[in-house]
Amino acid sequence: MDFGTVVRRRIKQAPPDRGGWNIFFTLIDRSIPNTNPYGNQAIRADGKAGWDGWPASPRIEALRAAWLDAADPDEQRRICVELQQQLWQDTPFIPMGEYWQATAYRRDLTDVSSGCFATFFGVRRV
């Protein structure tokens, strides 16, 4: 199936026997800021308004909001520990693997961007 069809079909909230989905694969690009509870799309649990699969957990969402409101790094760490425990309870996603794309660049190229998509703007030859 082509990716355009996946994108159209994965938003259907019907059961699989009526054209909906209950699982799909995707990737999260390293360049997307998913290193904190705010930027990580995969741990969102805001129900039907959220990402495909529509996980719903008011507690996860409350902890994400509390992390944003935390006054200092120690409080953020405490909230992250609690959030991680809640994520094991509600499990909004399951990572099924990881890959790294082996890439080589010529020595005379600089300013090559990182990420999973090839972009050539800004690259310079020295």
Q: How does the language model describe each region?
A:
Residues 17-24, 70-107:
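Bilobed periplasmic-binding protein-like "clamshell/Venus-flytrap" ligand-binding domains
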Residues 1-42, 80:
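Periplasmic binding protein-like
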Residues 8, 58-65, 74-85:
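Solvent-exposed, polar/charged alpha-helical surfaces in well-ordered, non-transmembrane soluble domains
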Residues 25-40, 61-71, 89-92:
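Short flexible/disordered coil segments
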Residues 2, 70-74, 119:
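Short linear motifs at secondary-structure transitions and domain/linker junctions
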Residues 3, 24-25, 54, 93, ...:
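Phenylalanine-focused residue identity feature
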Residues 11-19, 38-69, 98-126:
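Short, solvent-exposed loop/beta-turn-alpha elements that line the ligand-binding surface or hinge
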